[in-house]
């Protein structure tokens, strides 16, 4: 009997399921199709043998890449070798992907089957998977699939933020719309303010400058010599400023109320802000085009190149277009009208706005437009598919167009394309090396800054974490020092050596003589048995026979000890101690006098 198992790959892990006999399943294929939708009937056909969950999202991505490439991952190998029967001839494994089935059959030796009833079983498993695996909900399964799908797509598609052409499409569309709006609003300001100061329209032609002047002047009767300097700043022409001042004194315009002037000034300020935003947007578009399509920008200009990209839909679509399509791009209406009426087709579309076609003679406009479209197609392909974008090729292509234009006018033979491209390749390699070196420097600087920041954070965190243990150590060291001081004081009292105390006072010698004599008399009379008793009774009564060690003791403490030791000694010992001490005193005085 051949056992049929089904392998199901999910975003959360691998699942191995067992089915009934192959013959029985194949005979009941219509019943299988019906029972797939019903969970109860599906449980009678399929049972879960093993489930191997992925440890992390990175492991899930690795397994997904392996399955898509037809490679048996170690996790899949471990699952199949562990849970499938050892007799491989009696096992039939159903898989959804023929590539992974062929890899399993080649590496592990299991017979694999795809299609037919296996596809229906996998459809049912996919539908009821969250019910087959314990602890898995439909929501968590959907989240896992979504996350794995995003990570898998990011790995497959090389996405570069700096090469996004969507911003160029939106920017050029907004720029065209702003031009229309600024023109319309400026005409409205001219008509509105013209009732009060009609002579200003004839003096100033620029819309933005007119709106600034209308905002600054306001009531023309208030214009005087003091405002002449500001007028020169706005018009950037002293003669025009003087003419405006003279015209305001003899203007034929009607008077206007204050509320009307407020509305005119408010609307003029809006138009001025729109014109300023238009300038900043144009600067942004130029910088974006130099990043995304530097060769096309160098060849035909930022505005025309952006319009070509926007009309094509993307830089990739523009690179796919042939030169004939690029030539008439933007003139589709005229093209289809000419085809319909069997007239002459247009010679150029959006590329007409470039300076080359305007400089060419009437008979050469078609020829130069065809040549320019060819170079634009090459430049767009270089920009689209080059790893390091550079404007070297665009500059060389522009030189070729200039040479062709001069050839049409003067007959001067241009350089060959092969020589120009060889020169461009050398310069492009140098420019690419320079760009990569700059990028590496920037990356190194960024990494250094990041390391410094992390080191500062680590130092601050270590200081914060070590502040509390240090406080604990300080508090614990204080009682330890007190404990250490006690035994240090005891030997000083008992007559231990302390080199820090100077040997200067003569009183210490007197006390030392008394102590030494008493200790010697006690040793002679008491014998060996009396010494341990004395130590047990009072440890402070221990004496030191070395005169150097005993000389360091303080006089007051020794007197106290001597008074304490008097009752301990017996009567005859006491008398002997007194007599010996008197003799010692006399001897000590004689030694001092000598």
From Swiss-Prot:
Main subcellular location: nucleus
GO process terms (BP): ribosomal small subunit biogenesis
Any one GO MF annotation of this record: snoRNA binding
Residues with PTM Phosphoserine: 314, 466-467, 511, 519-520, 537, 563, 569-570, 579, 581
Biased composition (Basic residues): 580-594
InterPro entries reported for this sequence: Nop56/Nop58, NOP58/56_N, Nop_C, Nop_dom, Nop_dom_sf, NOSIC
UniProt family annotation: Belongs to the NOP5/NOP56 family.
Role: Involved in the early to middle stages of 60S ribosomal subunit biogenesis. Required for the biogenesis of box C/D snoRNAs such U3, U8 and U14 snoRNAs. Part of the small subunit (SSU) processome, first precursor of the small eukaryotic ribosomal subunit. During the assembly of the SSU processome in the nucleolus, many ribosome biogenesis factors, an RNA chaperone and ribosomal proteins associate with the nascent pre-rRNA and work in concert to generate RNA folding, modifications, rearrangements and cleavage as well as targeted degradation of pre-ribosomal RNA by the RNA exosome.
Protein name per the record: Nucleolar protein 56
Organism the protein comes from: Macaca fascicularis (Crab-eating macaque)
Gene: NOP56
């Amino acid at each position: 009997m051949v056992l049929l198992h089904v392998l199901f790959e999910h975003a959360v892990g691998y699942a191995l399921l067992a089915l009934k006999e192959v013959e029985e399943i194949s005979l009941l294929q219509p019943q299988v199709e019906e029972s797939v939708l019903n969970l109860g009937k599906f449980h009678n056909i399929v049972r879960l043998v093993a489930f191997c969950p992925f440890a992390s999202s990175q492991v899930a991505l690795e397994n997904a890449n392996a399955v898509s490439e037809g490679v048996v991952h170690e996790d899949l190998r471990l699952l199949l070798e562990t849970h499938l029967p050892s007799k491989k001839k009696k096992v039939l494994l159903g898989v959804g992907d023929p590539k992974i089935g062929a890899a399993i059959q080649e590496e592990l030796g299991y017979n694999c089957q795809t299609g037919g009833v296996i596809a229906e079983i996998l459809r049912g498993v996919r539908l009821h998977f969250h019910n087959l695996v314990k602890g898995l909900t439909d929501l968590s399964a959907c989240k896992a699939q979504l996350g794995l799908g995003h990570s898998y797509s990011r790995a497959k598609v090389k996405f570069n933020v700096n090469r996004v052409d969507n911003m160029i499409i939106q920017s050029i569309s907004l720029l065209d719309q702003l031009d229309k709006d600024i023109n319309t609003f400026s005409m409205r300001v001219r008509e509105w303010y013209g009732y009060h100061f009609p002579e200003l329209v004839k003096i100033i032609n620029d819309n933005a400058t007119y709106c600034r002047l209308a905002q600054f002047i306001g009531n023309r009767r208030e214009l005087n010599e003091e405002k002449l300097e500001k007028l020169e700043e706005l018009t950037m022409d002293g003669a025009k400023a003087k003419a405006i001042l003279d015209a305001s004194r003899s203007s034929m315009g009607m008077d206007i109320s204050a509320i009307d002037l407020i509305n005119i000034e408010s609307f003029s300020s809006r138009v001025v802000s729109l014109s300023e935003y238009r300038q900043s947007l144009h600067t942004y578009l130029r910088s974006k085009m130099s990043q995304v399509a530097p060769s096309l920008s160098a060849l035909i200009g930022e505005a025309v190149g952006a319009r070509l990209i926007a009309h094509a839909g993307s830089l990739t679509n523009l690179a796919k277009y042939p030169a004939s399509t690029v030539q008439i791009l933007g003139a589709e209406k005229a093209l289809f009208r000419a085809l319909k009426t069997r007239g002459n087709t247009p010679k150029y579309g959006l590329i007409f706005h470039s300076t080359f076609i305007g400089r060419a003679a009437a008979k050469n406009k078609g020829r130069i437009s065809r040549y320019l479209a060819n170079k634009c197609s090459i430049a767009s392909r270089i920009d689209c598919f080059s790893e390091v974008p550079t404007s070297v090729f665009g500059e060389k292509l522009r030189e070729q167009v200039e040479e062709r234009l001069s050839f049409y006018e003067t007959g001067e033979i241009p350089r060959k394309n092969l020589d120009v491209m060889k020169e461009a390749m050398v310069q492009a390699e140098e420019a690419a090396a320079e760009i990569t070196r700059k990028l590496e420097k920037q990356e190194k600087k960024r990494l250094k800054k990041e390391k410094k920041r992390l080191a500062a954070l680590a130092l601050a965190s270590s200081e914060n974490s070590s502040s509390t243990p240090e406080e604990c150590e300080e508090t614990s060291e204080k009682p330890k020092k007190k404990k250490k001081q006690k035994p240090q004081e005891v030997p000083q009292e008992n007559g231990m050596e302390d080199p820090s105390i100077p040997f200067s006072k003569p009183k210490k010698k007197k006390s030392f003589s008394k102590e030494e004599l008493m200790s010697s008399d006690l040793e002679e009379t008491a014998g060996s048995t009396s010494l341990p008793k004395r130590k047990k009774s009072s440890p402070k009564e221990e004496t030191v026979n070395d005169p150097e060690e005993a000389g360091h003791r303080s006089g007051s403490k020794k007197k106290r000890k001597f008074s304490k030791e008097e009752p301990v000694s017996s009567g005859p010992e006491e008398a002997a101690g007194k007599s010996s001490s008197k003799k010692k005193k006399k001897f000590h005085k004689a030694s001092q006098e000598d």
